[in-house]
Design a protein with these regions (language model features):
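N-terminal secretory signal peptides and thylakoid transit peptides that target proteins
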Residues: 1-18
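Flexible, low-complexity segments enriched for small/polar residues
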Residues: 31-141
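Short, functional C-terminal segments
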Residues: 144-149
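Ser/Thr/Pro/Gly-rich low-complexity linker/stalk segments immediately outside membranes or between
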Residues: 26-29
Length: 149
């Protein structure tokens, strides 16, 4: 049985870890570029061309669309999305919450797919909401362009 002291220690440690993640935020957009470069090809499997010169450009345009979509959200929602990307970009929380042990550029499509499926079907609503946010941002940015229809 967890004691009150253990509960408080765990809460403080978790809060400290999240604050460290915010302080360690990369200079660019909170690590979103690196995370999105890894997630977009996995989430858009079947829609993106498998190979070819167009693939990197389509990923970059989708990432740009995600950034535009985030910029159009309410400030409170932008903050929550920023916290989601902080969680995924900061190595200790990425490892614990997503189970991705290698840096995003080195993560395999299978590992990323497993992470996404685990969040999609999680028993925790917070993880399901995180998956839904990633899904909606990426698919919204992809299908907002007429050339993807």
């Amino acid at each position: 049985m967890t004691t009150r002291r253990e509960f408080l220690k765990t809460g403080l440690a978790g809060g400290l870890l999240l604050n460290l993640a915010a302080c360690a935020r990369p200079l660019e957009n909170g690590g979103r570029t690196v995370v999105l470069n890894a997630l977009i090809p996995v989430m858009l499997t079947g829609a993106l061309p498998a190979d070819g010169n167009a693939r990197p450009e389509l990923i970059a345009r989708t990432r740009s669309g995600v950034e535009r979509a985030i910029a159009g959200l309410a400030p409170a929602t932008q903050k929550e999305i920023g916290e989601l990307f902080d969680l995924l970009a900061f190595p200790p929380t990425r490892m614990l919450a997503a189970g991705i042990w290698s840096p995003w550029p080195e993560a395999t499509p299978a590992a990323i797919g497993n992470f996404l499926e685990s969040w999609r079907h999680s028993r925790f609503d917070l993880l399901k909401s995180g998956y839904a946010a990633l899904h909606d941002l990426i698919f919204g940015a992809w299908y907002a362009r007429p050339d993807t229809w």
